[in-house]
Amino acid sequence: MPLTPPPDYTKPFIAVVVGGTLAAFVLLLTRNTLPHTGDNLHSLPHGGTYCDGTKRIRYGGPHRSHVPELPAKSWALITVVAILIALHFSCLRTHRVHRCVLCHTTSG
């Protein structure tokens, strides 16, 4: 009876992980996070005006804040730099000299 290696499931596992990642990426890219305005037939997420014989909708759209917005990559860079600076200062503050007690004992 010859010995056979166990089945290798790495390729199907990689395919499942890549497929799941792509599905999550597409889901996040196609998601609408704008506020809902209007009714079930007329949607004005970016602002605008709609008028017909029975209804009139006027919506100004989402407003920008007065705080200047930085791109997401800038926030990530700022966060990484802040963490590195915090680690650097924490290492400076806890700098201790370690000595081997057994090496520096005097035999008398």
UniProtKB/Swiss-Prot annotation:
The chain crosses the membrane at residues 9-29, 72-92. It comes from the Viruses. Residues 1-8, 93-108 are cytoplasmic. Pfam families: Plant_vir_prot (PF01307). One of its GO terms (biological process) is transport of virus in host, cell to cell. It is found in: Host endoplasmic reticulum membrane. Keywords: Host endoplasmic reticulum, Host membrane, Membrane, Transmembrane, Transmembrane helix, Transport, Viral movement protein. Belongs to the Tymovirales TGBp2 protein family. Plays a role in viral cell-to-cell propagation, by facilitating genome transport to neighboring plant cells through plasmosdesmata,. TGBp1, TGBp2 and TGBp3 seem to act together for cell-to-cell propagation. TGBp1 is the main movement protein that physically cross the plasmodesma with the viral genome. TGBp2 and TGBp3 would facilitate TGBp1 function. This is Movement protein TGB2. It comes from Lily virus X.
